């Protein structure tokens, strides 16, 4: 009997040894969904990250572009993707908060599992270099004289640019600007260069070379534009930023989410990655996935208030 038991144990051990080892995740390329146009801010940042993903991960990314509607098309694709660990994507905040509050979106912030935040990008007011406007205050004064005549480009609707525009409208109801929406920053900037609009609400990175930045909507001056005053310095009490993160569809296996978080953290701590981000004008700021989920929850009240004041809150 004892001999039989030993034989059984030996056979079980042989069976385990014969089993193939579990494949390391990821074992095939990962689809990376970008919800904005190629060449825009989100794409530039993701391309830098891809370079270092290839340094640390065994499989590459396959970029999939789904631009339009302020990111809602791409965000929906991420939320609805099979949660098998092989589709992830870039998300923008406050976009993913605003859109479900104002529309019948097919996602909410709870539709995602957050890998990490990678960028905290303050917004700015930018004009062409030959623009007659030298400050945001001059634009406001001109808008008071000719309400609705000044056209401002936004990536939207229901984007971070749009939220800043709504905050402006609430603060300066007598200085109406007209918003013009674009699919991505590349389209928006081309429109400004072509004279289709008079100014942009934009991010700093996309404005440094081609435009004159009037003011930055941040608590303090931007390191890339140290001579440009903040809106508060100009007497305009507004702060606005866009946070960029990466996420997977809700339902991803915890082990795969953890693996992604480890890989992204390695990238975000890589000195060469940080140097490349700085060179590209991308304000890198890492926040882990759980902390970022808590940050999003804390932004709901502001988003609801802004949409309600503009009559855009979903009935």
Feature-to-residue mapping (PLM):
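An extracytoplasmic/periplasmic, membrane-proximal ligand-sensing/linker region
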Residues: 27-29, 170-171, 254-315
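Short coil/turn segments
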Residues: 37-39, 93-94, 128-133, 155-159, ...
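Bacterial N-terminal signal peptides
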Residues: 8-18
